[in-house]
Amino acid sequence: MKIAQIQMAVSADKETNLRRAGELLRQTAAGGIDVGVLPEMFCCPYDNKCFDAYSEPEGGPAQQALSALASELGIYLIGGSLPEKTDGKLYNTSYVYDRRGHQIARHRKVHLFDIDVADGQRFFESDTLSPGREITVFDTEFGPMGLCICFDFRFEELARLMTLRGARVLFVPAAFNMTTGPAHWKLLFRQRAVDNQLFTVGTSPARDTAASYTAYGHSIVCDPWGTVLRQCGAGEEIAVTELDLERLDAVRRQLPLLSARRTDLYRLETEN
């Protein structure tokens, strides 16, 4: 399965961002890919002051553009995330489209990014956004895939539940910052890959030091052994990676962590 991560620069103009996403996806799809992945808030500055103004309802123009791109290019498209407004509430939402442009998944960020690091980053998504309430795993011709957004990925229970629901790859549109990125970005993607014996794919916006929130960049792919297969730099970049899904099965046979769990002693429970 060949994936393309679009680590794009995000401007203050929504239409410009949508056009740029299309340009970069068309550029890489010409070489043949199966899945395109955009970053968190790819069409909106990551700023509480912007989320409402840039938001759109379910089926809005940005979503229509993503659907059309997936159909035009014949790819699965993980549309990063964008501000969605439904029933007066704002969500940080990722939409997924199949090769025909049909929406096959929607993930609303479950864990809102509320942090205040001494001498570092301060941000409170809960000032404007509401949390989602669903764990997201979707089917493809390559098997089930998991999807979460940025801060969601820090919670090991969520990754494990997606794994137990069959996910073979965890796709994570994310915008870590210059406080948390250098400290935790690579560590977390390797850790989740090793713990759950699957591929992890983190796709960030490009770094913009003039923005009110500076993304770390360094989009990353790790395999089920924790090996970093690909890592971008800080600027705008397209990263194409071939995922050998048989590698996942081999690692799980050789080091059978999931089947060795003592579910008679411990287990995860969810309330639906």
Pin down the residues of each PLM region.
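Short, acidic/polar
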Residues: 16-27, 154-160
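Short beta-strand segments enriched in small/hydrophobic residues
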Residues: 1-8
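CN hydrolase (nitrilase-like) catalytic-core segments centered on the catalytic cysteine
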Residues: 58-78, 144, 150-239
